[in-house]
């Protein structure tokens, strides 16, 4: 036999064993089409699927489950309301057969009973397309584990099953459960609502408690995965112990509860999420009360979010704030009154004692127990009740379509389960202002609500404080919550406080929520969107202060005209330019005089012209550097200055040669004069300087560069030569050598005739240049920044002034104030006197 035949044989055997005469029950309403109902009217403390036992458990031996009876009444109310409606199923009587599954203890026997014929036989067939079961659809049961058990049977027959509160995401697998639908959002939405609640209140340090069954494990795992994506950490997760049926808690289980509550006390987390059936929580909360663990926020899963019996433990109000995730409340007119006057479940009528029936269809204490909670049930509103109510109406609308009903009649005919299933998938109707239809996963998109537990008898015990919409996956309409804290402040549940702006996180331990906050150093910033654990360096042209989230442009610093040092240097340069120009005019007017000729004659005009050009180069030091200004700084000015110094050095050498070396080396002196020695020397020096300048420009380039001021990193110094310090000695080496040579020859000519003795003036100029250059190098080794540029420019101008005024100034003074000394006769007399002294 195939797998299908083997499965059917197993079902037949189980049905033969379990279908014995059962206890009396009247959870039955005859009709043309019967609905099966599976509800937990009783519950044990730890459900066991009794596949290994030959005897069906007696549910009445367990405690009454008020919510289960309330949901059963919702099914009965919906069926009676439909039967009284002349338009939905006119002429058709809808009936029901309800069985108590006592949570997860009794699922197999009822489903076999629903699948069997009236004679309690389930025949083995190759094709069940034309098979007629006892019921056309099943409503329930209430939890995911039971739903899977039932669905595995019903799916073989494609008998429609609509669950009203099972949320497991596994139930969306339509390959495994093709006949299963539900009128409640999936666990994915329940967990998402919890996570968005935590995000809204910035709780990222959470405790998770789960039950030891499939419900707790699966939802705890789903929550953990979802929290990890949102950087919410689980401080610890524990499994709550539960009791065996009709057994007291063992010492090991009690010690386990004590240990869990001890961990709650020691943890810094103050938000506790509990995924567990209500049955597992009574002993747990009693232990919490005993240890007086207070100040926490308890987030309840839908299994106990609106449980009236657990809410009846009024001492829970002292433990903290209780929030729950549950389905929306939809008022059902007339239901509260129906629940209150429903007759007590009694023995079955005599007309049915000869027919087939099943066990677990009685609940002697259900009505009394429910009435004792009637106030809280009435104030809390119809939540899961509406899910049952809409499930029954979904079947009724499918029958309406399948039977071809109009406003007055329906065509009664045989309804096969697979036919009804197809129509249920198609239903789309409005029920109490809510649209009911099934999405591709078989779910109805009713929105969820966040409820807060209240113990004020005048208020709703489960007050809605927010709504979650599955289609938008958004938490909205968040209202004020009454926190059990001082001044009603929002509780804080964070492993580490949020870092301030511009602080990076340094992980502490294994949890991403536990960290130290460290300020980002200057020059770095924190980009929260990319990396919260590392500060990023600012770009080269930007800077930041400590603890910044962005960088700002560095201030570009260069010499500007409005600055006082620049103005002072510019005035000196203007003074030098004007004085040099005046000297040039004076020398031009007295070109043929002995003083001008002794100073060098045409060579003086070359020097003065180059000095004027050098003064005109001074303005290029001011303002942002460009390629053209850098060319002037690095090429034009050094050439001008070097030629001036070379003229002085050559002139000093020429005078010494004329008076001291001509007689000793007449031949050499004649070559010097004949082949224009001074000009050849100056040309050689000029070419050598040009080579030095070109090498320097090739090494450093002409493009302006930027560098950070080491004393003030927010400042960027714009300069022409990035390696100015290193190249300064190389660029000035020739000038320093010429100054030493000029000084030496001037010193050698200190005994020459007064009119030719320029030792004092050349010594002044050359000594000043040498000293200033050495001082500039020393200054640059100690300081940096734009101050170096200012000092460099100042030294340059002073060196030019030293030549203009120190070398040419005394000669102008003699020309203007002692004209009698500017005659050939005077010069000849001075030469004769020098000659006589030597003799």
UniProtKB/Swiss-Prot annotation:
Residues 20-566, 624-635, 703-727, 782-784 are extracellular. Disulfide bonds: none annotated. Glycans are attached at residues 84, 248, 292, 312, 368, 407, 428, 487, 527. GO terms for biological process: sensory perception of taste. It comes from the Eukaryota. GO terms for molecular function: 1-pyrroline-5-carboxylate dehydrogenase activity; G protein-coupled receptor activity. Keywords: Cell membrane, G-protein coupled receptor, Glycoprotein, Membrane, Receptor, Sensory transduction, Signal, Taste, Transducer, Transmembrane, Transmembrane helix. Residues 588-602, 657-681, 749-760, 806-839 are cytoplasmic. The keyword Transmembrane applies. It is a multi-pass membrane protein. Residues 1-19 form the signal peptide. The keyword Transmembrane applies. It is found in: Cell membrane. The chain crosses the membrane at residues 567-587, 603-623, 636-656, 682-702, 728-748, 761-781, 785-805. GO terms for cellular component: plasma membrane. Putative taste receptor. TAS1R2/TAS1R3 recognizes diverse natural and synthetic sweeteners. Forms heterodimers with TAS1R3. Belongs to the G-protein coupled receptor 3 family. TAS1R subfamily. This is Taste receptor type 1 member 2. It comes from Gorilla gorilla gorilla. The lineage of its organism: Eukaryota, Metazoa, Chordata, Craniata, Vertebrata.
């Amino acid at each position: 036999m195939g797998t299908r035949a083997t499965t059917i044989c197993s079902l037949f055997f189980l049905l033969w064993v379990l279908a014995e005469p059962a206890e009396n029950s009247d959870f039955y309403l005859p009709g043309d089409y019967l609905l099966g109902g599976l509800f937990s009217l009783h519950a044990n403390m730890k459900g066991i699927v009794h596949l290994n036992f030959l005897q069906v458990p007696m549910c009445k031996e367990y405690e009454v489950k008020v919510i289960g009876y309330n949901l059963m009444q919702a099914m009965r109310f919906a069926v009676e309301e439909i039967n009284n409606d002349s338009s939905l199923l006119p002429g058709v009587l809808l009936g029901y057969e309800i069985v108590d599954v006592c949570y997860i203890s009794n699922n197999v026997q009822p489903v076999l009973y629903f699948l069997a014929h009236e004679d309690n036989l389930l025949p083995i067939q190759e094709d069940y397309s034309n098979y007629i079961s006892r019921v056309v659809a099943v409503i329930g049961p209430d939890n995911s584990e039971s739903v899977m058990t039932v669905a595995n049977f019903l799916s073989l027959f494609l008998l429609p099953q609509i669950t009203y509160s099972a949320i497991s995401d596994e139930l969306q697998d339509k390959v495994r459960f093709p006949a299963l639908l539900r009128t409640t959002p999936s666990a994915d939405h329940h967990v998402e609502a919890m996570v968005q609640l935590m995000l809204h209140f910035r709780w990222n340090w959470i405790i998770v408690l789960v039950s030891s069954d499939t419900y707790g494990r699966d939802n705890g795992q789903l929550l953990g995965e979802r929290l990890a994506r949102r950087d919410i950490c689980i401080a610890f997760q524990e499994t709550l112990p539960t009791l065996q049926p009709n057994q007291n808690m063992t010492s090991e289980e009690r010690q386990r509860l004590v240990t869990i509550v001890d961990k709650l006390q020691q943890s810094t987390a103050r938000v506790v999420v509990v995924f567990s059936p209500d049955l597992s929580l009574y002993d747990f909360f009693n232990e919490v009360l005993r240890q007086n663990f207070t100040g926490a926020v308890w987030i309840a899963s839908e299994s106990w979010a609106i449980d009236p019996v657990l809410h009846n433990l009024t001492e829970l109000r002292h433990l903290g704030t209780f929030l729950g995730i549950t389905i929306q409340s939809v008022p059902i007119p007339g239901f509260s009154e129906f629940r209150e006057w429903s007759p007590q479940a009694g023995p079955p009528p005599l007309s049915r004692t000869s027919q087939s029936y099943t066990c677990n269809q009685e609940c002697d204490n259900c009505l009394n127990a429910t009435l004792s909670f009637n106030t809280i049930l009435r104030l809390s509103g119809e939540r899961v009740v509406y899910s049952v109510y809409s499930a029954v109406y979904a079947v009724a609308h499918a029958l309406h379509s399948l039977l071809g009903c109009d406003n007055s009649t329906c065509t009664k005919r045989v309804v096969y389960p697979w036919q009804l299933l197809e129509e249920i998938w198609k239903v789309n109707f409005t029920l109490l202002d809510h649209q009911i239809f099934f999405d591709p996963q078989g779910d109805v998109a009713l929105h969820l609500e966040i409820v807060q537990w209240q113990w004020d008898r005048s208020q709703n015990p489960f007050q809605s404080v927010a709504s979650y919409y599955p289609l938008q996956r958004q938490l909205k309409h968040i209202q004020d919550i009454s926190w059990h804290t001082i001044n009603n402040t929002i509780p804080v549940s964070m492993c580490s406080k949020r870092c301030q702006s511009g602080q990076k996180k340094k992980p502490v331990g294994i949890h991403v929520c536990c960290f130290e906050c460290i300020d980002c150093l200057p020059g770095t910033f924190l980009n929260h969107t990319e990396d919260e654990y590392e500060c990023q360096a600012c770009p080269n042209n930007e800077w930041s202060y400590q603890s910044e989230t962005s960088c700002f442009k560095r201030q570009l610093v260069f010499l500007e005209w409005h600055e006082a040092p620049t103005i002072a240097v510019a005035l000196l340069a203007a003074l030098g330019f004007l004085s040099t120009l005046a000297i040039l005019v004076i020398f031009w007017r007295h070109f043929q005089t002995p003083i001008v000729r002794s100073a060098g004659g045409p060579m003086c005009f070359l020097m003065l012209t180059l000095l004027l050009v050098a003064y005109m180069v001074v303005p290029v030091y001011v303002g942002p550097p460009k390629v053209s200004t850098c060319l002037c700084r690095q090429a034009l000015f050094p050439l001008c200055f070097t030629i001036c110094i070379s003229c002085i050095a050559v002139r000093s050498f020429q005078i010494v040669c004329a008076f001291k070396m001509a007689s000793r080396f007449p031949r050499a002196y004649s070559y010097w004069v004949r082949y224009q020695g001074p000009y050849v020397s100056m040309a050689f020096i000029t070419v050598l300087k040009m080579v030095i300048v070109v090498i320097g420009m090739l090494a450093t380039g002409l493009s302006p560069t930027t560098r950070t001021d080491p004393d003030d990193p927010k400042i960027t110094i714009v300069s022409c030569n990035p390696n100015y310090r290193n190249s300064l000695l190389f660029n000035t080496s020739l000038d320093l050598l010429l100054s030493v040579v000029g000084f030496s020859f001037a010193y050698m000519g200190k005994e020459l005739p007064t009119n030719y003795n320029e030792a004092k003036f050349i010594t002044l100029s050359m000594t000043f240049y040498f000293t200033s250059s050495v001082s500039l190098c020393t200054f640059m080794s100690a300081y940096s920044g734009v101050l170096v540029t200012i000092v460099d420019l100042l030294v340059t101008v002073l060196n030019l002034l030293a030549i203009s005024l120190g070398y040419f100034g005394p000669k102008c003074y003699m020309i203007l104030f002692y004209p009698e000394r500017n005659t050939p006769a005077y010069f000849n007399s001075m030469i004769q006197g020098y000659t006589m002294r030597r003799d």
